[in-house]
UniProtKB/Swiss-Prot annotation:
InterPro entries linked: Pancreatic_hormone-like, Pancreatic_hormone-like_CS
GO molecular function, one term: neuropeptide Y receptor binding
Protein's UniProt name: Peptide YY-like
Organism: Myoxocephalus scorpius
Keyword Signal: no
Amino acid sequence: YPPQPESPGGNASPEDWAKYHAAVRHYVNLITRQRY
């Protein structure tokens, strides 16, 4: 499996959070694609 994205932390900027959420969505898509 690819490494899970790390949370930016409490003092992260909104841009960092947006990048993190996009990375999480991509990560979940990779995992579910491999499973089926």
